[in-house]
């Protein structure tokens, strides 16, 4: 075992096919272990999305493994526990028979997760908690900045070093605004919220960024549901939305951004508001790195350090929209959006409409079903109590993989007035918009 290293250099001196370029398709390191059958005591996967992306959900894996030899014992110097690493990769598969009479096994990729916590619960049992790639973004810092670029370029900067898939139409859109210093997860959330994208990692090893589907892709009948856990909840009525749009322009005046006594060494100084990076100047130290939200300064002699520069000027406008078809006795319940700093004035109206459209879907249906080919963000039609139909988006699936291919599901949508016989296989005939 090799420990305490920062990098490994591989030098290839020869190949078995002279005259051809060497191609390295991947690199696996450490022990490759497969657990299946009785070795997997518990396996729970939580998949969740937010259709508006006002938050990026983190999918999780909770796993308990059995090993008769005690290889996962913390106290075993020759065991596997000693080589486990934070962010260790887990790839999960579920083998399922298509029906009770079938002998053919179908393997479903349940996603890729990265180890966050683990513990020994006995001599033979070990419990693991892992998160998806969005969970990794939550611990990855991002310096932010002021932008006037395309969505594709900004996503590439935020997700540098991460595998992702971005819808081509979204990538070509223009985006402008400001991102503060924060995590890459928060930065990606701001982008997705501004442009109307869904972000999801389920059943994949990549971060997928795409517009939410608008057409129905499946029907969940009562026969696929288990009898326990069915519930329909009416969500609060939202009567309107107020969206603050932001615009940033470089100021012309040089201002004092920072002033304090610093000891010798290299210091990172963060600003309370964005500044033009090229305008930064330092006295009392040497400027070694600069950005919109920060600068790094090296001080050789302890003393006063002053940073000056030109601030960006923020101007805001507020757009207000009211929901349509409100009941006459509706009490005001207005949502406010104030901190979406990538929402420029030209994007405010579309964002407000998306929010009202989503919150017009007031029927939240939770149930347990035999899982199939459905994935998060699918637009589904669900048969509910009394044969009523709810058309909505699949927002959550929670799997118990050791108890069969079962999933606890949440679908949020609206009641359909048409019967099931009108279902065409893709959409309901005569279907109208929500708002």
Regions found by a protein language model. Name each.
Residues 1-147, 177-179, 185, 190-196, ...:
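Assembly/oligomerization scaffold segments
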Residues 138, 154-180:
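N-terminal export/assembly leaders
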Residues 152-156, 185-188:
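Extracytoplasmic/secreted envelope proteins and their assembly/folding machinery
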Residues 87, 376-380:
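Loop/turn positions that initiate beta-strands
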Residues 208, 394-399, 403, 416-435:
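Viral virion structural and adsorption modules
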Residues 28-47, 51, 138-149, 188-189, ...:
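Surface-exposed, non-catalytic interaction/assembly patches
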Residues 162-170, 193-208:
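Short, well-structured beta-strand/strand-turn elements
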Residues 92, 382-383:
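A generic structural signal for residues embedded in beta-strands
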